[in-house]
Amino acid sequence: MFFIIHSLVTSVFLTALGPQNRTMHFVTEFVLLGFHGQREMQSCFFSFILVLYLLTLLGNGAIVCAVKLDRRLHTPMYILLGNFAFLEIWYISSTVPNMLVNILSEIKTISFSGCFLQFYFFFSLGTTECFFLSVMAYDRYLAICRPLHYPSIMTGKFCIILVCVCWVGGFLCYPVPIVLISQLPFCGPNIIDHLVCDPGPLFALACISAPSTELICYTFNSMIIFGPFLSILGSYTLVIRAVLCIPSGAGRTKAFSTCGSHLMVVSLFYGTLMVMYVSPTSGNPAGMQKIITLVYTAMTPFLNPLIYSLRNKDMKDALKRVLGLTVSQN
């Protein structure tokens, strides 16, 4: 499904953002400055980001393989987790490869269409992540607060429907804001002092003020961030209340272990998002915005397998079984 959406959206956006549809735009490319500094410092930064990226692909890829190959993990909880890990691979890949190329390149340019395509996929994948975190919290709520009804509610069919809603819904949220921003006149300068194509720097480069477009983007960001966040908060309020009523200490520990890992992921992801996109960003220096962006574009996908998935005993056992199967076949 992701590849179908990717192909359709790419062709549509390349047509919509092509030169023939941008008669008012004098800028044909942007310059992404990224982290600029001494060459030795940039080399260290490149090595750090590259290792982080490869480990992220390895960790999340291992989770996807474990969920797919181990029948014991063919349950709603792990199907959601496998999709989440697959999402993280594409989320970090939407920005980090271009970031790595920019560090090594003397010419740090990105085309007008390429900039807005990166903008679209980065924000759409981030929105999909918000939706998945909300659905995963709902799944834990059903499992802990309504265990007797859980098998009849969270069926395989319903789980697949939720997965499809997350993917499709995430990619349908941002076309309107992105098209509105792309139609603004950009007559120069074209330097974006950021790691990625972000709405804040793009608004600053526009030749005219666009308060209505800024308001639409701010409203979209707030709704997409706070809607799923309030859903997660509600689910875990009920979960924590139910866990505290469990008489067995071992049962409480197991429930808190699973939910605690998910809450760590939610806190890390949503904390940086709210600082970046909900609070006014005009007061934040460019360096601080880059650090915050690096946290939720690279650090969060890297840490998710460690603090959420790989701490799970069933997942670790599945990874060992999959590794053993691979070794025996070779």
Curated annotation (Swiss-Prot):
Glycosylated position list: 21
Membrane topology listed for this record: Multi-pass membrane protein
TM region positions: 44-64, 73-93, 118-138, 158-178, 216-235, 256-276, 290-310
Cytoplasmic compartment spans: 65-72, 139-157, 236-255, 311-330
Record key words, sorted: Cell membrane, Disulfide bond, G-protein coupled receptor, Glycoprotein, Membrane, Olfaction, Receptor, Sensory transduction, Transducer, Transmembrane, Transmembrane helix
Membrane topology, Extracellular segments: 1-43, 94-117, 179-215, 277-289
Disulphide-bonded residues: 115-207
Molecular function as annotated in GO: G protein-coupled receptor activity; olfactory receptor activity
Gene3D superfamilies tied to this protein: Rhodopsin 7-helix transmembrane proteins
Gene Ontology CC terms, in alphabetical order: plasma membrane
Subcellular location: Cell membrane
Domain of life: Eukaryota
Keyword match Cell inner membrane: no
Keyword Signal in record: no
Record function comment: Odorant receptor.
Family membership: Belongs to the G-protein coupled receptor 1 family.
Protein name (record): Olfactory receptor 11H6
Organism the protein comes from: Homo sapiens (Human)
Source lineage: Eukaryota, Metazoa, Chordata, Craniata, Vertebrata
Gene designation: OR11H6
